[in-house]
């Protein structure tokens, strides 16, 4: 096979795969990962709202956050300096599309079940559902759970078994609304004492409900909760990946929405990054053909750009 044939074959195979970041096996996702600086800034603890339209890499970077290898790969590739060591981040997948990244834990609550629980409620009531979601997923995360007293661990393990049920999660919080905050306070003290950061991640929120008005209510409640937790705790954050249209609608739902601007990161691609992204998989397929400088994908310096 000639060099030309090798290149054509590599180009034809670029698009092969599942085509959706949530379904691609982790090894494949990391192999094709080409992060940009705005994606790496997602790792800053106080960036609690991540905005990006379709195709900007929200789900890809969301999944990278959940992996030790993924976090280190993103920071190493972009060169963005972080205040917090990514190795000391305890990432907890709080909500995503249907199945969890860990196939051994319960699925996320279904949209119909969520709608049934929050219908006719206000933003304050939806916060309780999201509190239940966070605490249930905490109960399914061994390393985060180990930071808590034994009595809290036992309660959360039981709650974790009901993580797929929106009704049970909401009822658990409604039974004693002070209990989840007391547990989070204890988690914050333990994490701070060990130099750790516990981060609850949320993605695919457009699939949390089937009706647009319910989505606005749910996202508004989640953003309100995330803002309050960032004020109350030193080492606990909610990190929410959101489409611009959902952000706009949800911002109307609670009075402090304007204060989220300082906690916001928008995923942005420069034109040069798009060109590099186009050639990156081609280069990966042709390692035996292209050797040397073409395999080095460092971003140009300011001087080189000129």
Predicted regions and their residues:
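N-terminal pre-Walker A segment at the start of P-loop NTPase domains
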Residues: 2-39
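Short, flexible loop/turn elements at secondary-structure junctions
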Residues: 3, 11, 15-18, 52-55, ...
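Extended alpha-helical coiled-coil/bundle linker/stalk regions that scaffold oligomerization
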Residues: 5-18, 191-200, 306
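P-loop NTPase nucleotide-binding core
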Residues: 46-47, 53-198, 208-213
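Active-site-adjacent bridging/hinge elements
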Residues: 30-38, 99-111, 195-202, 250-255, ...
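Pre-Walker A-like glycine/lysine-rich segment at the N-terminus of P-loop NTPase domains
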Residues: 31, 37-55
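Generic structural signal for hydrophobic core residues of well-folded globular domains
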Residues: 14, 33, 37, 65, ...
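The catalytic "switch" region of P-loop NTPases
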Residues: 181, 186-190, 197-199, 205-306
């Amino acid at each position: 096979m000639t060099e030309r044939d090798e290149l054509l074959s590599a180009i034809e195979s670029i698009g092969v795969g599942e085509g959706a970041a949530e379904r691609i096996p982790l090894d494949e996702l990391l192999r094709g990962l080409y992060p940009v600086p705005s994606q790496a800034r997602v790792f800053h603890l106080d960036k609690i709202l991540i905005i990006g339209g379709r195709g900007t890499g929200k789900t890809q970077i969301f999944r990278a956050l959940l992996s030790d290898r993924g976090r280190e790969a993103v920071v190493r590739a972009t060169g963005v300096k972080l205040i917090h060591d990514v190795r000391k981040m305890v990432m907890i997948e709080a909500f995503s599309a249907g199945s969890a990244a860990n196939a051994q834990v319960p699925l996320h609550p279904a949209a119909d079940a969520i709608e049934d629980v929050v219908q006719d409620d206000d933003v304050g009531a939806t916060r309780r559902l999201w509190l239940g979601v966070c605490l249930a997923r905490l109960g399914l995360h061994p390393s985060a759970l180990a930071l808590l007293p034994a009595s809290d661990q036992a309660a959360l393990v039981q709650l974790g078994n009901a993580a797929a049920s929106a009704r049970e999660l909401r009822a658990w919080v409604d039974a004693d609304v002070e209990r989840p905050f007391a547990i989070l306070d204890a988690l914050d003290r333990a994490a701070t004492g060990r130099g750790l950061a516990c981060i609850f991640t949320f993605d695919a929120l457009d699939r949390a409900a089937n009706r647009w008005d319910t989505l606005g209510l749910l996202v508004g409640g989640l953003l309100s909760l995330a803002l309050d937790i960032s004020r109350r705790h030193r080492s606990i954050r909610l990190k929410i990946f959101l489409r611009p249209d959902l952000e706009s609608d949800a911002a109307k739902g609670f009075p402090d929405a304007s204060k989220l601007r300082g906690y916001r990161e928008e995923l942005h691609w420069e034109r040069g990054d798009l060109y590099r992204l186009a050639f990156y998989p081609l280069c990966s397929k042709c390692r035996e053909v292209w050797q040397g400088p073409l395999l080095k994908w460092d971003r140009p310096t300011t001087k080189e750009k000129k």
